[in-house]
């Protein structure tokens, strides 16, 4: 944003003053704005040393490093201000949840482990951050983060690694922080945003979250509708299936109601419905040239929607009565494919149109858009400090910088949106 930054300097100062209002001291507000400008300026690396050089703050490099790494400001307070600001503009219809990897060469940074990340497409040495985004059709913003702590970093876990647990002190990891599954971190972030007064009624996530029944149940307990990805191995009964009570033989405990047929994999249920059940749906127009109404490429495929009863021990344990609850199964089955290629579960109402199911499921593209923008220009993985606090400070300010870019696009757009 190099040359453009001077033109919007006043806007940036006003935005920084609003978002950094929770800072207790004037010097924190000053360094917050300086760091924000460093992230927004053109440059290959967005770590302290090169940013200080580009900003002409070489003599204050240590002060900038202290601000981001160890200064005692609460990142959650900044994120809450950011969330309020962006909610007014985005008018979110959906919360989107995902995680991204921060690749690392060494093992000294907080929570670095060998783990799978989609960033690299393999198991590698990295940190993993779970993020929560406000989204509408026209814009989105990341408003909350959690750094995932693997079991190897948790001294209370049987999988604890003594070398890693010894690093907790130097990394400043709070004693009360232990291993928490990513899906639970996502629910915790939803609870936190609600405590800020932000309540969005619909959640979207990929199969890394949707495959976990406890996550789906957690969304339902919070009164949230959802459309979440699932794997082909997820099992379910058909909507018409009914449990029955086997005859009692007169000895032992009475038998409990059970479904006469075993649950089937969702892929088999869709294949059984047949290709003729697939309907064409266009969910949006992309940014590349094409045949859409605006001259852009149409995002289009064929989809099957079935009413089914998701199965599994966790679902049964949390169901009142003998019948499993009915949910939507959505599957994408392109005309060029022999089998369906992607699957989602949803608790949206039974009369929800197919187009609404598809548009909601596909809204997850916004989180990929946010990640791509941040990684290309704002350096979320460029933080070279090793502390727990510093990581949360850095990704929070990257989110602030990304939100400022989004606001500038909305301001300049004739339609008042930031669509990409």
Give a label for each model feature.
Residues 107, 371-378:
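Active-site-adjacent bridging/hinge elements
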Residues 33-34, 49, 342, 355, ...:
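Non-catalytic, well-ordered alpha-helical scaffold segments
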Residues 346, 354-361, 376-393, 412-415:
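Short, solvent-exposed helix-loop connector elements
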Residues 13, 137-171, 175-178, 231, ...:
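An anionic, glycine-rich sequence signature occurring as long contiguous blocks
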Residues 111-116, 217-219, 223-226, 376-397:
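Compositionally biased, low-complexity linear motifs
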Residues 2-204, 208-235, 242, 250, ...:
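Conserved, well-structured functional cores that handle cations and Mg-NTP chemistry
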Residues 368, 400:
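Hydrophobic, well-ordered secondary-structure elements that form the walls
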Residues 402-420:
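Conserved nucleotidyltransferase catalytic core and NTase-mimicking acidic/glycine-rich helix/loop elements
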């Amino acid at each position: 944003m190099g040359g453009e930054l001077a033109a919007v300097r006043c806007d940036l100062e006003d935005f920084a003053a609003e978002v950094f209002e929770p800072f207790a001291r004037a010097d924190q507000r000053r360094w917050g704005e300086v760091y924000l400008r460093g992230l927004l300026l053109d440059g290959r690396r967005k770590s302290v040393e090169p940013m200080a050089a580009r900003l002409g703050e070489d003599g204050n490099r240590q002060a900038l490093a202290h601000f981001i790494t160890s200064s005692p400001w609460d990142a959650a307070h900044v994120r809450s201000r950011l969330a309020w600001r962006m909610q007014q503009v985005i008018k979110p219809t959906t919360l989107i949840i995902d995680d991204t990897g921060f690749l690392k060469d060494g093992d000294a940074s907080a929570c670095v482990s060998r783990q799978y990340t989609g960033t690299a497409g393999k198991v590698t040495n990295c940190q993993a951050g779970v993020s929560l985004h406000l989204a509408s059709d026209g814009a989105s913003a990341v408003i909350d983060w959690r750094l995932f702590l693997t079991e190897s970093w948790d001294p209370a876990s049987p999988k604890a690694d003594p070398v890693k647990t010894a690093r907790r002190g130097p990394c400043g990891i709070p004693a009360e922080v232990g291993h928490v599954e990513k899906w639970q971190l996502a629910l915790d972030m939803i609870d936190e945003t609600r405590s800020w007064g932000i309540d969005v009624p619909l959640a979207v996530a990929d199969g890394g979250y949707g495959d976990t029944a406890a996550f789906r149940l957690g969304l339902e307990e919070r009164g949230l509708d959802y459309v979440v990805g699932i794997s082909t191995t997820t099992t379910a009964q058909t909507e018409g299936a009914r449990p029955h009570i086997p005859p009692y033989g007169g000895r032992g405990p009475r038998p409990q109601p059970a479904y006469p047929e075993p649950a089937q994999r969702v892929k088999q249920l869709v294949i059984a419905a047949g290709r003729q059940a697939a309907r064409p749906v266009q969910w949006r127009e992309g940014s590349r040239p094409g045949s859409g109404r605006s001259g852009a490429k149409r995002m289009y495929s064929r989809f099957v929607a079935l009413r089914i009863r998701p199965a599994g021990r966790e679902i049964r344990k949390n169901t009142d009565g003998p019948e499993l609850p009915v949910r939507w199964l959505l599957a994408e089955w392109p005309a060029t494919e022999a089998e369906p290629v992607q699957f989602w579960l949803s608790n949206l109402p039974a009369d929800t149109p197919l187009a609404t199911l598809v548009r909601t499921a596909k809204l997850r593209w916004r989180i990929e858009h946010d990640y791509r923008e941040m990684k290309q220009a704002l350096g979320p993985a460029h933080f070279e400090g090793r502390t727990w606090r510093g990581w949360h400070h850095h990704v929070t300010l990257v989110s602030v910088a990304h939100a400022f870019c989004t606001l500038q696009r909305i301001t300049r757009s004739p339609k008042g949106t930031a669509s990409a």
